[in-house]
Amino acid sequence: MRPKKTILCVDDNEQVLSVRTFLLETRGYRVVAVNTAQEAVEMLERSLPGTLDLILCDLLMPQMDGNELVRRAKQLHPGLPAMIVSGTVNAFDRALHADVFLPKGASSPAEMIERIRVLVARKRGPKKATPPATTQPPSVPSFAHATAS
């Protein structure tokens, strides 16, 4: 059995955080749920590289928005994929540093789970391809033919 992927989930709305945590855990993910971006930064500072597989956060939060949180997360963990979800969808509020932006209400939970699956797989890197078996004739030693003069 493959180890569970760990998602740092950040939302200042406790109800949204609870629902999102439940959704992810029932799909087999391990969730670290926090209510503030500052808590998330502290978690990121304490975590070893590779221990988190994705950060999923709200765009609009008090003290620090999702863009700033993702920017800091990527400074601390450069390969960490990030998804921002928000109910506000205007050009100025779009996620600048996230790999994926999903508007709340315009995307289904199934779409969010699929995007998470793709991001986590991308973090892991492409599947290692096995080199194709080549059928070459066995090498035959070559002998220099001496010509009699």
Feature map (PLM): residue ranges:
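Conserved acidic segment of CheY-like receiver
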Residues: 4-15, 20-24, 55
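Acidic, metal-coordinating helix/loop segments flanking the phosphotransfer/catalytic sites
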Residues: 33-54
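Active-site residues of response regulator receiver
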Residues: 58
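Receiver (REC) domain active-site loop signature in two-component systems and cognate sites
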Residues: 61
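C-terminal output helix
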Residues: 105-120, 124, 128
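CheY-like receiver
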Residues: 121-149
